[in-house]
Amino acid sequence: MADKSVKKVVLAYSGGLDTSIILKWLQTEYGAEVITFTADLGQGEEIEPARAKALAAGVKPENIFIEDVREEFVRDYVFPMFRANTVYEGQYLLGTSIARPLIAKKQIEIARKMGADAVSHGATGKGNDQVRFELGYYGLEPDITVIAPWREWDFKSREALLDFAEKHQIQITKDKRGEAPFSVDANLLHSSSEGKVLEDPAVEAPEFVHMRTIAPEDAPDAPTIITIDFEKGDPVAIDGVAMSPATLLTKLNELGRDNGVGRLDLVENRFVGMKSRGVYETPGGTILLAAHRGIESITLDRGAMHLKDELMPKYASLVYNGFWFSPEREMLQAAIDYSQDKVTGRVRVKLYKGNVTVIGRESPYSLYDQDLVTFEEGKVAYDHRDAGGFIKLNALRLRVLAKRDKRG
């Protein structure tokens, strides 16, 4: 039942099918004044058409907000996440998850500015995004009213949604096969495709699903070799050319795309309890992760590196589940950021037919001591004879256990 007390609602609006229907539904069911927010996250398509669609749906010009947030997205969300080498369930680089808190933050800021008493999103009632959006809303504005149409209206499937769209003359985009498109999410970090034939995890994804990369087998026969410069854990330059965060990630995406890097077909465990299959493309992020681990390998102490690796799965779960604004994520971030103080230097990377290989790394803060590790003779701080006592001390408890077991 619609809450008729809601007067103004800020809708996260893409201009696509779902949010176009939601816009009309909010106007008719709630009788509310709708304010739209459209974020340019680097999704690779023009977002200005969203303005025309909102106007055509009766939204006042002053209630239409379109903002280019690419630099903020990469600087304040993507890069902090990559300082942690964040990977969910060993594979997923969290391209969708990391965009939701920024959108939620912008909606709340607009709601405060415009005096809106509610916010709304287009996430379905089965997915993770509903959780991510709403935890973001409540984490920033605890008393805000949240309208989640997919949990309220009578549409139970995408087919019913298409019927509603046709009835109300809402434009339905088509892909080149003449069918309604896959469920797609895209931003500067990644693109994802779900639904239709992808719902069967036994069936290989058709090639036309991939939007961001060429097939690895079609990539050039010669490798591409680049350098990436880091300062305090963040990439700042490619091949010696300084770039802004969004520009740098865009360039890495282009390099990854041309070399077939960053494709991923996985089944993941959603926070809401079910498994889902998706096809992800994260070309620039895949390169960045490998390069960052490369520079950390010579600048981080073993203890700090191993502790970071232990903390990373928890950090990844917090991001995946929507707890970006939680104190525990901020605590972990503080520790991770502290670890990055000396993560500065240059990494050389080879891109070849879907593979990313670190082939060189250097840093003014390197902990790698060539004199110490060399097999050649020389004056070094390491005495081979010391290893005997080290081994015996570490073996002590194992020897005690073995003696007990021998006694029976």
Curated annotation (Swiss-Prot):
GO-annotated molecular function: argininosuccinate synthase activity; ATP binding
Pfam families: Arginosuc_syn_C, Arginosuc_synth
Binding positions (L-aspartate): T124, N128, D129
SUPFAM superfamilies in the cross-refs: Adenine nucleotide alpha hydrolases-like, Argininosuccinate synthetase, C-terminal domain
Reaction(s) catalysed by this chain's protein: L-citrulline + L-aspartate + ATP = 2-(N(omega)-L-arginino)succinate + AMP + diphosphate + H(+)
GO biological process entries: argininosuccinate metabolic process; L-arginine biosynthetic process; urea cycle
Record PROSITE patterns: ARGININOSUCCIN_SYN_1 (PS00564), ARGININOSUCCIN_SYN_2 (PS00565)
Subunit structure: Homotetramer.
Protein name, UniProt field: Argininosuccinate synthase
Organism: Caulobacter vibrioides (strain NA1000 / CB15N) (Caulobacter crescentus)
Top-level taxonomy: Bacteria, Pseudomonadati, Pseudomonadota, Alphaproteobacteria, Caulobacterales
